[in-house]
Amino acid sequence: MAVQQNKKSPSKRGMHRSHNALNTPGTAIEPTTGEVHLRHHISPTGFYRGRKVLKTKADA
């Protein structure tokens, strides 16, 4: 089992953990419907960047 050679100071420990924070997912609002969706993904109504790109069950 690995054993550290020197104790890591609280400052260095904090620097090591500085990139471990969780980020909120990037969301966007569809301009035509006003729905919130993940960026670079189709909205639940089938719109992407203001254009209808996918037929949904509601359309049929």
Curated annotation (Swiss-Prot):
UniProtKB keywords: Ribonucleoprotein, Ribosomal protein
Biased composition (Basic residues): 9-19
Database matches in SUPFAM superfamilies: Zn-binding ribosomal proteins
GO biological process, any: translation
One protein family per Pfam: Ribosomal_L32p
Signal peptide (from-to): none
Keyword Ribonucleoprotein: yes
A single MF term (Gene Ontology): structural constituent of ribosome
Region (Disordered) location: 1-46
InterPro entries linked to this entry: Ribosomal_bL32, Ribosomal_bL32_bact, Ribosomal_zn-bd
GO CC annotations, alphabetized: large ribosomal subunit
HAMAP family per the UniProt record, alphabetical: Ribosomal_bL32 (MF_00340)
PANTHER family with a match to the protein in the record: 50S RIBOSOMAL PROTEIN L32, LARGE RIBOSOMAL SUBUNIT PROTEIN BL32
Entry's family note: Belongs to the bacterial ribosomal protein bL32 family.
Protein name according to UniProt: Large ribosomal subunit protein bL32
